[in-house]
């Protein structure tokens, strides 16, 4: 059993995509009994209860006293102490930038192998000269740098330098949790007073890049073609009031439901209530604000729902165009409206896409399959290359 230390700013109970990614992988690595895991992560509300549950599951979480960890002396000392105390063989930096700058220090403390994972924000880093030099140092100091999509790799590979060993490790989907669920669908449709109305769902943090504003603006056009069409926007974020005002200004406030943030255990049901899942994401900030992958599309597919994705970054990699869903220009209200209306009208095609999506995700995107690949990277098995 190899001994692994995960050093990360992003870990449950804090919510977010990276947090979920790391939490899912840690749970499966521990469950496989191939790795003894220790996690070093920041303090967060609810951490005590989470850490008790982690201990019961078979791994230890050590909390940094503040909510942010930087690659300075304080984190360095604590990390090296943990490496010594637990006789750590492999250090895994959950987000390469910036904490993986400590890779050489981890080796000095006794770690024989260092892995760093990327997610999407490194694309922005690669566009800034000083930040780009940080990525080069990380590439030089680690054994493996993982990436979540071919798109992100294409954008930042040169920044990590020729010495970096870049390996594909996307997020997975729990296909036992995310599945077609008629009972949950009926319950939530009753809660939100949707009845049998044709419904498009967008589940994501409410920020401009995700394209909820495009869906709201497209809804009048969709409703002219699809009687009773409704939009359910799931999630919280700084864009909420802007979206509420936009719905009012577009005359569709009565047909848009804002659920706010929902409990993690209710996320599968919110996918299941949809007839179509759409997130017309778009790239912003001259390419610095981009969708790294888009796990929500895969979760919707696992629930048997056809998906519509914007063509930002790695999002198209989560859709088999014209088979599991559609990829559209997320900047175009007309194209988004056409795609949504098309699938709401042609129910046979939509159902077939949903079934194909479920089959694809089950075959290619399960967490257990990807965790086995990560386990090889952590051990340094040549077969993983």
Swiss-Prot record:
The protein's role, per its UniProt record: Involved in the biosynthesis of phosphatidyl-myo-inositol mannosides (PIM) which are early precursors in the biosynthesis of lipomannans (LM) and lipoarabinomannans (LAM). Catalyzes the addition of a mannosyl residue from GDP-D-mannose (GDP-Man) to the position 6 of a phosphatidyl-myo-inositol bearing an alpha-1,2-linked mannose residue (PIM1) to generate phosphatidyl-myo-inositol bearing alpha-1,2- and alpha-1,6-linked mannose residues (Ac1PIM2).
Keywords: Glycosyltransferase, Lipid biosynthesis, Lipid metabolism, Phospholipid biosynthesis, Phospholipid metabolism, Transferase, Virulence
Enzyme class per UniProt: transferase
The keyword Lipoprotein appears for this protein: no
Organism expressing this protein natively: Mycobacterium tuberculosis (strain ATCC 25618 / H37Rv)
PANTHER family listed in its UniProt record: SULFOQUINOVOSYL TRANSFERASE SQD2
Catalytic activity: a 1,2-diacyl-sn-glycero-3-phospho-[alpha-D-mannopyranosyl-(1<->6)-D-myo-inositol] + GDP-alpha-D-mannose = a 2,6-O-bis(alpha-D-mannopyranosyl)-1-phosphatidyl-1D-myo-inositol + GDP + H(+); a 1,2-diacyl-sn-glycero-3-phospho-[alpha-D-6-acyl-mannopyranosyl-(1<->6)-D-myo-inositol] + GDP-alpha-D-mannose = a 2-O-(alpha-D-mannosyl)-6-O-(6-O-acyl-alpha-D-mannosyl)-1-phosphatidyl-1D-myo-inositol + GDP + H(+)
Entry similarity comment: Belongs to the glycosyltransferase group 1 family. Glycosyltransferase 4 subfamily.
Pathway the protein acts in: Phospholipid metabolism; phosphatidylinositol metabolism
EC number in record: 2.4.1.346
Record GO biological process: glycolipid biosynthetic process; phosphatidylinositol metabolic process; phospholipid biosynthetic process
Protein name per Swiss-Prot or TrEMBL: GDP-mannose-dependent alpha-(1-6)-phosphatidylinositol monomannoside mannosyltransferase
InterPro entries listed in its UniProt record: Glyco_trans_1 (IPR001296), Glyco_trans_4-like_N (IPR028098), Glycosyltransferase_grp1 (IPR050194)
SUPFAM superfamilies: UDP-Glycosyltransferase/glycogen phosphorylase
Superkingdom of origin: Bacteria
High-level lineage: Bacteria, Bacillati, Actinomycetota, Actinomycetes, Mycobacteriales
